[in-house]
Amino acid sequence: MGQGIAKAFAQVDGYEVALCDIKQEWADGGKEKIKKGYARLVEKGKMTQEAVDAILAKITPGLKEDLCADCDLIVEAAFEDMGVKKTTFQELDKIAKPECIFASNTSSLSITEIGNGLTRPMVGMHFFNPAPVMKLVEVIRGENTTDEVNDKVVAIAKEIGKTPVEVKEAAGFVVNRILIPMINEAV
């Protein structure tokens, strides 16, 4: 999912993307997968190589401790494990500049709990697969999410061509809260 989110931002003018992972080779591999995906679009005539090169030039793979100090927005896309997400943001809280916005791409975990103990407000920014194509983004407000942070993330979602849906923190947020009962009914 992180690769798709990186593409969603890099495809828009004005955004530079730090594609971070816990190992440099994993981050490099993520950019390589992005590159291969775009190569297929060039082969099919859906994009020019020049356009692809411009997008790829805006994606820098690396480690959070090397790339996140100057970020304005960090969208975390680790797997759905509360401990992993909390630890990731606690580490980022020591690295990122004070005005950096922290957003989690969680599909169901508590934004409030993820953000407890941080020095800044936390917000949810839940993309849907495939992130570069799907227009919907849930913007989830936790107990400590300020109006300023919420409004900024809504504006950013619009800037990158998404349709933000603002939701309060609740189990499954909006989409999964509707989707799961529908799937259960179908089964």
Q: How would you name each of these model-derived features?
A:
Residues 81-155:
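Rossmann-fold NAD(P)-binding glycine/threonine-rich loop
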Residues 22-29, 40-102, 108-113:
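Rossmann-like NAD(P)-binding element
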Residues 25-36, 54, 84, 148-159:
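A non-catalytic, amphipathic alpha-helix used as a structural packing/dimerization or gating element
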Residues 9, 31, 35-42, 75, ...:
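Structural signal for hydrophobic packing residues in well-ordered secondary-structure cores
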Residues 14-15, 137-170, 180-187:
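Internal alpha-helical scaffold of NAD(P)-dependent oxidoreductase catalytic cores
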Residues 1-40:
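NAD(P)+-binding Rossmann beta1-loop-alpha1 motif at the extreme N-terminus of oxidoreductases
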Residues 1, 34, 59, 74-77, ...:
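Buried hydrophobic positions in well-ordered alpha/beta secondary-structure cores of metabolic enzymes
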